[in-house]
Amino acid sequence: MTTETTTATATAKIPAPATPYQEDIARYWNNEARPVNLRLGDVDGLYHHHYGIGPVDRAALGDPEHSEYEKKVIAELHRLESAQAEFLMDHLGQAGPDDTLVDAGCGRGGSMVMAHRRFGSRVEGVTLSAAQADFGNRRARELRIDDHVRSRVCNMLDTPFDKGAVTASWNNESTMYVDLHDLFSEHSRFLKVGGRYVTITGCWNPRYGQPSKWVSQINAHFECNIHSRREYLRAMADNRLVPHTIVDLTPDTLPYWELRATSSLVTGIEKAFIESYRDGSFQYVLIAADRV
């Protein structure tokens, strides 16, 4: 089964969701309109679907009793989310205008815009959600970068990119929706030899023993399947992706969650993230690997 999409240059047949689960995920994100994603993006037009890192700027927040305090909290949360995307891009390696980058699980496209601004590269995003792809493409047109930045409805396990055609690719909090071996096999296929892969993700800590009750709550909330840190490294090694940088971002993301829990944008899952980070059962990590 395929769906047909038309671009300025060609009409491409893109695989539809391959399983009932993928259809569920597409439906989930097509219907998603959480204020925490939209209101933060309204700050500067970069719409993210990931969390933040770094210390909270308390001076910028000011007095909690001030009438503008909530607006400042929203701006600060957004700043931390953009800082996370910048940190991911710090690990993408060298890229330029002649290169193609891939955002697998691109959401509404905020990171794609940032990547194009930073590297000048063509950036291709894939998502199961037609609503997300439409949103991202509309923003690209508004910014007049749609000749370089494109989102498409596509299964990230079966992309249309040619073998060895991509310089760098990433998953930013989207790996928990797929089998890791299938995912890394696809990245390995379309990345050129020497290309760079980066992921930032939440993973359960094998040292804890099994996924904790907090991790189970996160899985249920997002209809996903969080993997262990060990599974990432094993699946990468099996697919010619050699990790060279692993950064534990758990202490860096906790301030974001603690601030978000005080805002009007809570979704009910904040406690699970905070408690699982504190008890060590859940970790937030960056892994960068090279295609060999």
Curated annotation (Swiss-Prot):
Lineage of producing organism: Bacteria, Bacillati, Actinomycetota, Actinomycetes, Kitasatosporales
Needed cofactors: Mg(2+)
Annotated function: Catalyzes the SAM-dependent methylation of geranyl diphosphate (GPP) to yield (E)-2-methylgeranyl diphosphate (2-MeGPP).
A GO term, aspect molecular function: S-adenosyl-L-methionine binding
Enzymatic reactions: (2E)-geranyl diphosphate + S-adenosyl-L-methionine = (E)-2-methylgeranyl diphosphate + S-adenosyl-L-homocysteine + H(+)
A matching Pfam family: Methyltransf_11
CDD domains, alphabetized: AdoMet_MTases (cd02440)
Superkingdom of origin: Bacteria
Family: Belongs to the geranyl diphosphate 2-C-methyltransferase family.
Protein name: Geranyl diphosphate 2-C-methyltransferase
UniProt cross-references to InterPro entries, sorted A to Z: Erg6_SMT_methyltransf (IPR050447), GPPMT_Stmyces (IPR049645), Methyltransf_11 (IPR013216), SAM-dependent_MTases_sf (IPR029063)
EC number in record: 2.1.1.255
GO biological process, one term: terpene metabolic process
Keywords: Magnesium, Methyltransferase, S-adenosyl-L-methionine, Transferase
Disulfide cross-links: none
